[in-house]
A protein has these predicted regions:
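Rossmann-fold NAD(P)-binding glycine/threonine-rich loop
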Residues: 106-124, 236-291
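Short beta-strand segments enriched in small/hydrophobic residues
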Residues: 29-39
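C-terminal helix-to-coil terminal segments
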Residues: 2-4, 275-318
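Positively charged, low-complexity intrinsically disordered leader regions
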Residues: 1-28
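Anion-binding alpha/beta catalytic cores of soluble intermediary-metabolism enzymes, centered on
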Residues: 93-162
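Short, well-structured alpha-helical segments in soluble
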Residues: 74-86
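Short beta-strand elements in bilobed, periplasmic/extracellular small-molecule ligand-binding domains
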Residues: 54-68, 191-193
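Glycine-rich phosphate/diphosphate-binding loop of Rossmann-like nucleotide-binding domains
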Residues: 37-51, 133-231, 235, 240, ...
């Protein structure tokens, strides 16, 4: 079987269109403030990409660069300053933070209404109750892609009875694995979460109608791990060296093998990451509305996008 590509661009484009319209409705230009306290090149690149994404939809972006050896107090002071600044709609703390700094304490310090990364305990608690208003962006991206795949998802328990989709999430991080599982549980999926302690990964993954992989290990999931016809959502973004000494980006799923078995599969790049960026923009709009800006209600990302992958195309393997 050759799988259909479940591409992120059609979903992301629709979200960006909605965000542009929302910016016009709000009555003031939202602003994202990013805090960078590292010289990590990946974090610097991510900050630049955030700025570019904001610019595309009319959201202001400002980068607050702190020293790579900034102290806990230095970063907490900056967070407090941005919390109190009414011109700042949204705050994101880029990782990693300096050695010896308590990242979780910093996440707790961000005003929950400005926490567009969805890492403050208040917003994580919202995920437990099924809210996507300021849920972690990648978890929202996973849900959007699963919805776009057309697998059965439900909001009504009577309709869901005995019909829930079998989902396996590989990885239990606080910003991807756990919240993805919770959001899918809220759609009456039967969710199994696997992690480093799982004794027989294959025994679990081959039962999955939807397989979500988010561990940061290139090629961990192979064709043998996948149920024929399953939907595979590959969250991993890993840079690996090629035989010619260069590098390329790959996921956590061994793509060529998986595409022969799966029914639908997200590409890397071009899948989850693309939608995650759009969800950050969506969260900025939600933050603006939570802070009392014009236009009530959270922005709805495009759910139920059809019974097949939007813009999906078959993967022809040689």
């Amino acid at each position: 079987m050759s799988a259909t590509l479940l591409e992120g661009a059609p979903i992301a484009d629709k979200i960006k269109e909605d965000v542009k319209a929302a910016v016009a409705e709000i009555g003031r230009v939202p602003k994202l403030a990013a805090i960078l306290a590292t010289d990590n090149k990946g974090a610097e690149f991510y900050a630049k990409s955030q700025g570019k994404a904001c610019e595309e939809v009319g959201i202001e972006f400002e980068l607050h660069q702190l020293a790579a050896d900034a102290s806990q107090a230095d970063i907490e002071t900056k967070i407090a300053e941005l919390n109190d600044n009414v011109a700042v709609t949204a705050i994101i703390l880029l990782m990693p933070v300096p050695a010896g700094v308590d990242g979780r304490a910093l996440q707790r310090a961000i005003d929950p209404k400005k926490d567009v990364d969805g890492v403050n305990p208040v917003n994580i608690g919202g995920v437990v109750q099924g809210s996507t208003t300021l849920a972690p962006c990648t978890a929202q991206a996973v849900l959007a892609l699963v919805e776009a795949s057309g697998v059965p998802l439900f909001t009504d328990p009577k309709e869901a009875q005995g019909k829930g989709t079998e989902v396996v999430v590989v990885g239990h991080s606080e910003i991807v694995g756990k919240p993805s599982g919770l959001l899918l549980l809220d759609k009456f999926c039967t969710v199994t979460v696997c992690h480093i302690g799982t004794q027989d990964l294959k025994a679990h993954t081959t039962k999955a109608d939807v397989l979500v992989v988010a561990v940061g290990v290139p090629g961990l999931v192979k064709g043998e791990h996948i149920k024929p016809g399953a939907t595979v959502v590959d969250v991993g973004i890993n840079r690996v060296k090629t035989d010619d000494g260069k590098s390329r980006i790959v996921g956590d799923v061994l793509f060529d093998e998986a595409a022969e078995i799966a029914g639908q599969i997200t590409p890397v790049p071009g899948g989850v990451g693309t939608v995650t960026t759009a969800m950050l923009l969506k969260n900025i709009i939600d933050a603006a509305r939570l802070q009392g800006h014009r236009s009530p209600g959270p922005l709805k990302f495009p759910g139920n996008l059809g019974q097949s992958a939007p813009g999906g195309r078959r993967v022809k393997l040689q």
